[in-house]
């Protein structure tokens, strides 16, 4: 059995910086045609020059791959700065509530203050897409749900602004997406295939710790159903986020799962298991093209076959290891060729 996926798109990707970027980028740039690149670096991408500099670093270390750049939402994003970014091809704003995830210490404290709403109004006028890490302070399993009132306010106040709930994790958010025409979402591999049991049901597994948290069986099943039917308002976004094992095995574990090396084989396995392989093309590419208005992307064909693939346990960067999701396991699908 074989399947060919055309122009795979990762709508939510972290490729880090410097040596780590060079070590992990190929796992995404080779099989994927394009990816929405997250801006929460150690020095966040808060303006056009730093964003374009990072884009150039990605382009230098890849080929036949389109990084879709995003700006880190901040109070200094004037109308002029947004216009400058838009003229250079930047189409995404990423809003991080302060302190909610990795490198979000510079995030937005009050999501509904006057300055935030002013920036969103300008973003709507210029045709930006707003990507939001939709969590608010509260009990860890309810943080996304607690952000619903903010999402509703945004959706109603800015009806022409496309708003993406990144890495949807709570089944209660599905109704919001279906209620508001301008609300969309991305889904990760880990949120549609894993639950809290994978993180802490046995021994604590730091390599399954991410934000938003993987949640209950009900959440996983409801989100998986969206993916399997390729719901038209949902696109695939891996949120692949590499960290060194030395940091993952520490007293202060950073959030993030490195899934890039297994994405296409694991998705094929999952969709085949549920008799939904015919919908994988839409989930992995077509929906994103429609939602984000993407065209003129690098052409790419990923051919996979139903042959065993033993997942490597680690990727290497200098003298450090990066644990790969499902490392050491055998998947039933294998990436055979990229053209």
UniProtKB/Swiss-Prot annotation:
Pathway: Pyrimidine metabolism; UMP biosynthesis via de novo pathway; (S)-dihydroorotate from bicarbonate: step 3/3. Zn(2+) 1 binds at residues 12, 14, 94, 239. Disulfide bonds: none annotated. Keywords: Hydrolase, Metal-binding, Pyrimidine biosynthesis, Zinc. Its EC number is 3.5.2.3. SUPFAM superfamilies: Metallo-dependent hydrolases. InterPro entries: DHOdimr (IPR004721), Dihydroorotase_CS (IPR002195), Metal_Hydrolase (IPR032466). Catalyzes the reversible cyclization of carbamoyl aspartate to dihydroorotate. This is Dihydroorotase. It comes from Helicobacter pylori (strain HPAG1). The lineage of its organism: Bacteria, Pseudomonadati, Campylobacterota, Epsilonproteobacteria, Campylobacterales. The gene is pyrC.
